[in-house]
Structures are given as structure tokens and as C-alpha cells.
Amino acid sequence: MAGLALAGSQRESESLLNFVVRRFVRDDGDLDGSGCTWFDQFRIYPHAWLLMAAILRARFDLVHRWSEFLQGFQDPENGGFYGTLQQRELRGEQEFMTTGVAAIALLWAGRTEAAVRTGHWMRRLLESQPDIRRQLFFVWDRQQGLVTSFPEDRATEYAVNCAATAQWYFQYGIGAALTAGLFGCTGDRSWLSLGRRFLDATKFCRDDVYRQAASGKIGWGAAWMYRVTRDSADRAIAEAVYTKLRTSQHSGGGWRADTIYSRDPGPHESGQMDLTSEFAALQSWMEDSLSLRA
């Protein structure tokens, strides 16, 4: 829905938003989870994108409901978000993607204090890294701190291994996108320094870091950083990701990535609705920033 609105399809965005509310949204603002194969793992992630869509469509009734819902999953002390009902009850794991995108959506909604708390959570997570040149651990346990031990078959869900390809590179971009937004709201340049550290860390990854479907959010973060820094290095990263994003779009207009989100990707030539909606939004934000002169 946000992707449709940013692409200029306002009526279609409004119609789809209305359909989602009628079909999937419960009275408390939660989704029923039907039709989403990754819902149990990233429980509140879709609410963040719905909140951004509601803001774009000036649906303030929905903005309030989803803002309140998301803030109910934020730890009031450390600023991270519990991605599932179970983790909130346990006061357990807070993973980077859900935490970052939820904070960005709340920043859009004017809930700056909540977003700033998440910014401090990100700084703490980054400063706790044993060696960011080798790995980016991106899950924080509320009781034990940075999670560095996990089952080998789930390693991709806990850390970016800089020596391997096809990692969840989007973590770096989410960090840069949020911190660029925090600088815009607060004028505090320390947020730009933090965003720079996230983007600089991508240089330790393999050469596919800007060419995977999981790289899309790196382009987003670099684009929002470039918008406020006019740094040629930020622009170069955004351009690299944007170019790959354009060339990987299927002839029918959609995108797909079998290693992200989908547990049942379907026919190879088809696009994935969730990924396509996100990539349309990311592409729009990159285009806007890349149109600016240095």
C-alpha cells in the first residue's frame, strides 16, 4: 500500500488499505495473520508498513491505532521491540529488522521519543559487536544482551557473516535509514555518525552486498543519508543498489526473493506481493534522493 501510494497510484492504495482493514485487521489493531507465511517470526513487522501507508493516505484513525499497537511492543527501558507476543511476554529477543522499521514508522507518526529510544538501542547493539569486520550480530536479548550463540542452521537469522554471500544485508540499511531520520528530527549529528558506521560496515561484506534482494534497504538507508549529507559515498551505494533493483524486476512488474520472507515462493516468474510492495517504496525513496545534486 505504501508502495502504491509512493508510485502515484493513490486510488489503488486507498482501495487496498480499505480491503486489508476489512479482511485482516482485528478490533485491537492487530492482524489476524492469515495468508502470511512468516507472520509467527516477524509478528509486528507488517504493522509498521501499514502504519506508513496510513500516514501517506492521511488515515489518522488507523495511524493512531497502529501507533498505539506498535508502541505496546517496545521495551520502555531499552527501546528495542519484541517481534512476537511470546518474546514480549518473556522480555526476550529483540531483532533488528522489526525494531528498526517499527521505529521508522513511529518517527513518521510523530512519536519521536519512541524512535530516539530505538536509536539508543541501535547504538548499544553496534558498540557491543565483538568484531564488525567479521560479523554483525543483530539480535539483542533483554536479559542477556547481544546474542552471539545460536543454532548453526539458524545463523542467518542472528548474524551477517561477512565471509559468506547471500546474507541478510538489509540490517545495515535499516540502521542508516532510522538514524538519518533521527538527525532530521533532532538536528543531533551523532545520529549521522551512527548511520555512517552502519554503511561503512557494509564494506567488510562480500561483493554481493549491494546486488542481492536483501540489499534493497541498504539503498534506502544510503539514499536517506545522502539526502542530508550530500556525501558522494552515500550516493554511490544508493546508485549501486538502485541499479540492481531495477534490473531484477520481473517483466510483470514484481520482484521476488526466495530467501527472504517467503516459505512457499510459488512460480519463479511471479512476483511476491510483500516484497514487491516494499521494493516499490524503496525504489521511490532512492529515486527521490538520487535526483538531488551533490
Question: Across the structure, where does each feature detected by a protein language model lie?
Answer:
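Glycan-recognition and catalytic cores of secretory/periplasmic carbohydrate-active enzymes
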Residues: 1-294
